[in-house]
A protein has these predicted regions:
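A "functional boundary" signal
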Residues: 21-316
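Hydrophobic h-region of N-terminal signal peptides that target proteins for export
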Residues: 13-21
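Bacterial N-terminal signal peptides that target proteins for export
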Residues: 1-8
Length: 316
């Protein structure tokens, strides 16, 4: 089942930073470190991102910027999540969690926990993911950490989604959104809105889906969440057959991706396929669909291509 559980939720919680340098950036780390972090984010799904993360960690250690150290360790977690390598991700997450707890930036502890669970879900291990979520819930309430509690609610939504109980999952997502808006006003609610948009899009309630998509785009606080919101909005517009609006959104999304790097590879590939379909480049669209790593997503796209090309025999 298609799902964007490979999201790395980049946090905007500031905490207490002891860096001596100026902090005129969204993450409140030393300004001299922020460009390095931006490069690491851009390349986090490529091996180069690991090297940049090492540089960031070393520089942050030298400057005694503990928050930047924690941020540096989110990059390997993101990389191994993107490559679906749970063994390596578990090792990277263990280091990230240890550093986060030592430096009292527990938001990054729970971010690492969430991504461990997401990787298990991506590999079809929903029962083990549920066990991990229960462990995270116990720790979050022990810490009385609001972001940790929110992460539990959100992650349980992901688990029920992957177990194909979308109604229960959607209730968790709505509860997570409500909790976030009430208790974590500085957090980025984009992905909550995206999840709800996807649910109503798949139910065929396009107008409701578009309403949530617009809220996601408006709420986006990071480059990553902005790209994610545009990708989702494009999907909604395509499903509603609003082709002119889709083309405009596609162009905007492409420009942002060129600027900030590829985020959510499968979603980007799907958009390329939609564009090829609209341009009647069906053979190329099939080739692109063959390159999708998720077999179910690939089959869905081939079905869409056959329908739009009028090849109903193969479509059904």
């Amino acid at each position: 089942m298609r799902r964007h559980t490979n999201i790395l939720i980049l946090l905007l919680l500031t905490g207490l930073c002891i860096s001596a340098g100026a902090q005129n950036n969204p993450y409140k780390i030393d300004d001299s470190l922020y460009p390095i972090f931006q490069r690491a984010i851009k390349w986090r799904t490529q091996p180069q991102g690991l090297l940049i993360a090492d540089t960031l960690y070393a520089e942050a250690t030298q400057k005694k910027d503990k928050k930047a150290q924690c941020l540096a360790l989110t990059i390997p977690v993101s990389f191994y999540l993107s490559t679906n390598n749970y063994e390596k991700l578990e090792q990277a997450a263990a280091r990230a969690k240890e550093e986060a707890r030592k430096n009292n930036y527990l938001q990054y502890y729970y971010s690492a926990c969430t991504n461990e669970i997401n990787c298990l879900l991506n590999n079809g291990h929903s029962l083990r993911a549920l066990q991990k979520a229960e462990e995270m819930k116990i720790q979050a309430f022990k810490d009385q950490h609001e972001y940790g509690i929110f992460s539990c609610i959100f992650t349980l939504g992901n688990i029920y989604y992957m177990r194909q109980n979308r109604e229960v999952a959607t209730e968790y997502y709505k509860n997570a959104l409500e909790y976030m808006l009430k208790n974590l006003p500085d957090q980025d609610p984009t992905y909550m809105y995206i999840n709800l948009s996807e649910y109503y899009r798949d139910k065929g309630e396009g107008e409701v889906a578009l309403e949530y998509a617009e809220k996601a785009a408006k709420a986006a606080k990071t480059n990553e969440s902005r790209v994610a919101s545009l990708l989702n909005k494009c999907e909604v517009l395509y499903s509603m057959k609003r082709i002119n609006d889709f083309n405009a959104c596609y162009d905007e999304c492409t420009q942002v991706i060129e600027q900030y790097g590829v985020i959510r590879k499968t979603a980007v590939q799907r958009l390329h396929i939609y564009k090829l379909i609209l341009n009647k480049n069906y053979d190329q669209a099939h080739t692109e669909a063959d390159s999708l790593r998720n077999l179910l997503s690939a089959n869905q796209m081939h079905h869409e291509i056959y329908l739009k090309s009028g090849n109903y025999e193969k479509a059904y």
